[in-house]
Amino acid sequence: MTGSIWAGSIWAIVPAAGRGTRFGGPLPKQYLQAGGQPLMAYTLMALAAHPALAGIVVAIAPDDADWPGWTAVQSKPVLTCLGGATRAASVLAGVLALPESVRADDFVLVHDAARPNLALADLDRLLEIGRGDPVGAILAAPVRDTLKRAGDDGGIDGTEPRERLWRALTPQLFRRHQLIRGLTEASAAGVDVTDEAMAMERMGLRPLLVEGAEDNFKVTTPADLARFEFELARRGIAVDADALEAPAVNAQSNARNVATQLATVSYGNDAT
């Protein structure tokens, strides 16, 4: 469906305000180098490769000195906004920073900044299936390993059935107004949702699971980075630096716009 009538109709949010403390080192993991480019370059290029993508909003940390200042990827606009202390806060900021042309019931993608190995076929399938559902869908992978439940003493308390268990991946696809309501309500309740589907679940909604490739992994450890570098070499992947345009959109200006929207947005009953 890459040549579908959806061309240029979907915006993506990339939360990139995290520090990646599990990885260690001075750089946030999304800026680690692989093949001569930051990891996030591959992430943005993978999204921009789909003709349905209209543009990307990247939520960055207020003190981010590493953001390369991209304003477009493959001629598709890249906007920035200031993210929050949690993933959910950054995603909400990104949703509120979307252009006015994005309507309340339009679908929006959310994708991890440090998940650079997204396949075009997976994104295509997610859009095809997710847009046919009133709620949306997420990429996910069936759990294949045997799962053990641990006791407080480190011993095994039991084995969990895996037949209906899936690992949540990204991108995740939901309507703009449902994202706003779900993330806002979770925050108000003091619940730190770890992905957007969890916010939907809290509202009683049931997103679809779309099976994605196992190699759509998130880079969280040095071993993950080495694995991605191996994939780059094996497949001969390179980023065309000319496809990444700068100077940067002013993040402080976007942040003021987000603050204004946070103060004035009305949620109503349109998110169910």
UniProtKB/Swiss-Prot annotation:
Transferase is among the record's keywords: yes
Question: What keywords does the record list, in alphabetical order?
Answer: Isoprene biosynthesis, Nucleotidyltransferase, Transferase
Q: Which SUPFAM superfamilies match?
A: Nucleotide-diphospho-sugar transferases
- Chain positions of site Positions MEP for the nucleophilic attack: 162, 218
Under catalytic activity, the entry for this protein gives: 2-C-methyl-D-erythritol 4-phosphate + CTP + H(+) = 4-CDP-2-C-methyl-D-erythritol + diphosphate
Statement: the UniProt record of this protein carries the keyword Ligase: no
One Pfam match: IspD
Q: GO molecular-function annotation terms?
A: 2-C-methyl-D-erythritol 4-phosphate cytidylyltransferase activity
Q: Name one GO biological process term.
A: isopentenyl diphosphate biosynthetic process, methylerythritol 4-phosphate pathway
> What EC number(s) would the UniProt record show?
2.7.7.60
InterPro entries named among the record's database cross-references: IspD, IspD/TarI, IspD/TarI_cytidylyltransf_bact, ISPD_synthase_CS, Nucleotide-diphossugar_trans
**Known pathway:** Isoprenoid biosynthesis; isopentenyl diphosphate biosynthesis via DXP pathway; isopentenyl diphosphate from 1-deoxy-D-xylulose 5-phosphate: step 2/6
Where are the residues marked Transition state stabilizer as a site? 22, 29
Q: Which PANTHER family match?
A: 2-C-METHYL-D-ERYTHRITOL 4-PHOSPHATE CYTIDYLYLTRANSFERASE, CHLOROPLASTIC
Family classification: Belongs to the IspD/TarI cytidylyltransferase family. IspD subfamily.
Report the function annotation for this chain: Catalyzes the formation of 4-diphosphocytidyl-2-C-methyl-D-erythritol from CTP and 2-C-methyl-D-erythritol 4-phosphate (MEP).
Identification of the protein by name: 2-C-methyl-D-erythritol 4-phosphate cytidylyltransferase
Identify the species of origin.
Xanthomonas oryzae pv. oryzae (strain KACC10331 / KXO85)
Point out the gene that encodes the protein.
ispD
